[in-house]
UniProtKB/Swiss-Prot annotation:
<comment type="similarity">
    <text>Belongs to the universal ribosomal protein uL14 family.</text>
</comment>
<comment type="function">
    <text>Binds to 23S rRNA.</text>
</comment>
<dbReference type="InterPro" id="IPR019972">
    <property type="entry name" value="Ribosomal_uL14_CS"/>
</dbReference>
<keyword id="KW-0687">Ribonucleoprotein</keyword>
<dbReference type="InterPro" id="IPR036853">
    <property type="entry name" value="Ribosomal_uL14_sf"/>
</dbReference>
<dbReference type="Pfam" id="PF00238">
    <property type="entry name" value="Ribosomal_L14"/>
</dbReference>
<keyword id="KW-0699">rRNA-binding</keyword>
<keyword id="KW-0694">RNA-binding</keyword>
<keyword id="KW-0934">Plastid</keyword>
<dbReference type="InterPro" id="IPR005745">
    <property type="entry name" value="Ribosomal_uL14_bac-type"/>
</dbReference>
<dbReference type="GO" id="GO:0022625">
    <property type="term" value="C:cytosolic large ribosomal subunit"/>
</dbReference>
<comment type="subunit">
    <text>Part of the 50S ribosomal subunit.</text>
</comment>
<dbReference type="InterPro" id="IPR000218">
    <property type="entry name" value="Ribosomal_uL14"/>
</dbReference>
<keyword id="KW-0689">Ribosomal protein</keyword>
<keyword id="KW-0150">Chloroplast</keyword>
<dbReference type="GO" id="GO:0009507">
    <property type="term" value="C:chloroplast"/>
</dbReference>
<dbReference type="GO" id="GO:0006412">
    <property type="term" value="P:translation"/>
</dbReference>
Length: 122
């Protein structure tokens, strides 16, 4: 469960290392964001000499959460960290690599480019 002021790791090589959620895109009454939700975030830590800089406002899609995800078949998936992938306005990833495992639910939400870049899909 991601809410405003939550810090997230970045799971790609776009140049950002840590994000802070400032808004959840979608219905205005969403309090928490889950896997597959798009958020507006600010970059809190960035890699030097990269296109993304600290304090830049960007969009990101959540790919891992510490809160467990329950599937229809009864399987429960829980990750060790909260992580997101930086995307542009069209929903394409800004980086060229994705690190770590991501959930299969992203494919159903039309983030197929992120799924194809991921080394492992759970």
């Amino acid at each position: 469960m991601i809410q405003p002021k939550t810090h997230l790791n970045v799971a790609d090589n776009s140049g950002a290392r840590e994000l802070m959620c400032i808004r959840i895109i979608g219905a205005s009454n969403h309090r928490y964001a889950h896997i597959g939700d798009v958020i507006v975030a600010v970059i809190k830590e960035a890699v030097p000499n990269m296109p993304l800089e600290r304090s830049e406002v960007i969009r990101a899609v959540i790919v891992r959460t510490c809160k467990e995800l329950k599937r229809d078949n009864g399987m429960i998936i829980r990750y060790d960290d909260n992580a997101a992938v930086v995307i542009d306005q069209e929903g394409n990833p800004r980086g060229t690599r994705v690190f770590g495992a991501i959930a299969r639910e992203l494919r159903q939400l039309n983030f197929t480019k992120i799924v194809s870049l991921a080394p492992e899909v759970l």
